[in-house]
């Protein structure tokens, strides 16, 4: 969960509540408070935020087992700064998150008195410091920063009233670094920005689920440095840079170059080309800690002891066209992309353990490619009245067919699972009258392959899912209560067409991971916001 805050520009307070209901009456209530404060001399400021959310569980097929979990979360924090001088600033941030989620049946009972429960309670505390120093001519900038986050999780992932399916996880991350930027009037052939720096990242993970014989301890440390130079002019921008990292789980340092170029041959046309490279260390990630219920047992993810790093090389090429037609501003974008993955991570089903639980091993496939084209268009009368749409065609395939099930009759598959070939979006925003705004938005997801696992692997199958179009509408109206206080009322419908998965698994032997399509059913929502 990421929290993005902003630097305050004036004193303000905002209090809001949004409440939503599905057709069956399932409620989702979210209340938030935000405040910005500035000192009279504008040398100090703070942005405070807090929110409380409560969402009921949702049972689509009325089988007594939730298809969307219940949620109870509280978030609070702040971001503040103090200008220590005319050319220096100290910034500090803190956030706290308490998040509880539970799905399954008999949610009013303790987890070990249910047929299926997937439950997790996270307590997250994090913060950071950053100090920036500029020279009077703005040509030199030095920044140093450090942040720390501590995550504590108490969980239960179990079936059939298992008293031993409780778990505890601790995960703390420290990041520290420094960066220097030098703005040059000319370097070789054009004005340029030179940036270099160093960073240290340490993550300490301990995940315990003794009922499943799992006691994972993982320490991951990465330290590295980077350098980048950007040449810029009105018609040409060129960026070249590189990063070198040493991770304690990889034998040799990893060198990751990157380059980008932007060229404007004529006033209304921008051409771009880029190359980036990267890697993923051979370690456990958040998704590896999750446990799913399948066929009355659970599925667990383990790491291949010989897991190797995953490397990527990505290329992009795009063209932007801008044009004014009367009062309408037009923008068209066409983009092609290609990514090659070497030793790509892959989940391979293995033989069940002695308790009958499904075992998936994170191992390496030889490689994979992701390539496609993307088109976007926007027409705007002004910032409040515009229409925007985009479409992407993408192919994601492994270099060789991969085994996704241990079933004797299950064919291998080259296509990446859960990766649609087609997806897109559309958004229409307008202000038909003073203080009134309206929006219509939608996302399209094409067909994809989703695995459906059963207790007997010979029954496993790949589902070719249907396409989905998730359409939403929203209206809002501003009412000036006083010269400085405004109330906004809003209402709308999410997923108007109730585009939702039709073949959700049923009962206590369900595959809890067999989920696809829009995340929420048709939901009517109403809101009110006060700002001053």
Describe the function of each predicted region:
Residues 1-2, 6-62, 69-76, 484:
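Outer-membrane beta-barrel translocator/receptor signature
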Residues 232-235, 332, 337-340, 361-454, ...:
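Gram-negative outer-membrane beta-barrel transporters
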Residues 120-126, 148, 152-237, 365, ...:
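Outer-membrane beta-barrel transmembrane domain signature of Gram-negative proteins
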């Amino acid at each position: 969960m990421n929290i993005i805050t902003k630097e305050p520009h004036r004193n303000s307070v905002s209090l809001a509540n949004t409440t939503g209901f599905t057709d069956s009456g399932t409620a989702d209530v979210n209340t938030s408070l935000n405040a910005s404060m500035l000192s009279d001399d504008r040398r100090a400021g703070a942005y405070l935020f807090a929110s409380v959310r409560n969402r009921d569980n949702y049972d689509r097929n009325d089988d007594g087992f939730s298809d969307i979990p219940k949620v109870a979360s509280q978030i609070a924090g702040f971001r503040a700064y103090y200008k220590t001088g005319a050319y220096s600033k100290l910034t500090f941030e803190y956030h706290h998150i308490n998040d509880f989620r539970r799905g399954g049946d008999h949610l009013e009972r303790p987890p070990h008195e249910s047929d299926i429960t997937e439950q997790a309670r996270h307590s997250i505390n994090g913060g950071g410091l950053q100090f920036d120093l500029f020279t009077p001519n703005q040509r030199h900038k030095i920044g140093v920063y450090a942040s720390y986050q501590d995550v504590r999780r108490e969980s239960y992932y179990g079936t059939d009233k298992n008293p031993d399916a409780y778990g505890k996880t601790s995960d703390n991350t420290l990041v520290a670094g420094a960066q220097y930027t030098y703005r040059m009037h000319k370097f070789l052939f054009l004005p340029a920005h030179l940036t270099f720096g160093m960073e240290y990242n340490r993550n300490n993970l301990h995940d315990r689920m003794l009922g499943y014989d799992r006691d994972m301890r993982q320490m991951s440390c990465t330290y590295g440095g980077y350098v980048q130079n950007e040449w810029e002019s009105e018609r040409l921008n060129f960026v070249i840079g590189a990063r070198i990292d040493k991770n304690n789980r990889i034998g040799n340092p990893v060198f990751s170059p990157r380059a980008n170029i932007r060229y404007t041959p004529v006033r209304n046309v921008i051409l771009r080309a880029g190359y980036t490279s990267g890697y993923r260390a051979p370690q456990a990630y958040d998704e590896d800690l999750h446990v799913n219920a399948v066929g009355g047992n659970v599925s667990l993810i383990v790491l291949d002891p010989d897991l190797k790093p995953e490397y990527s090389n990505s290329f992009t090429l795009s063209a932007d066209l801008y044009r004014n037609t009367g009062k309408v501003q037009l923008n068209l974008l066409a983009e092609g992309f290609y990514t090659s993955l070497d030793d790509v991570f892959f989940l391979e089903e293995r033989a069940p353990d002695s308790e009958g639980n499904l075992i998936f091993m994170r191992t390496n496939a030889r490689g994979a490619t992701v390539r496609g084209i993307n088109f976007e268009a926007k027409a705007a009368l002004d910032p409040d009245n515009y229409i925007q749409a985009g479409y992407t065609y993408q192919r994601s395939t492994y270099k060789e067919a991969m085994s996704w099930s241990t079933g004797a009759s299950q064919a291998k598959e080259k296509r990446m699972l859960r990766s649609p070939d087609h997806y897109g979006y559309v958004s229409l925003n307008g202000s038909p009258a003073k203080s009134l705004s309206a929006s219509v938005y939608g996302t399209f997801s094409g067909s994809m392959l989703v695995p459906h696992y059963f207790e007997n692997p010979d029954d496993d199958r790949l589902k070719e899912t249907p396409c989905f179009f998730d359409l939403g509408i929203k209206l809002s109206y501003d009412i000036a209560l006083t010269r400085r206080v405004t109330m906004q009322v809003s209402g709308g419908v999410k997923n108007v067409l109730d585009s939702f998965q039709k073949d959700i698994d049923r009962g206590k032997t369900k595959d809890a991971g067999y989920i696809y399509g829009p995340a929420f059913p048709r939901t009517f929502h109403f809101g009110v916001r006060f700002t001053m």
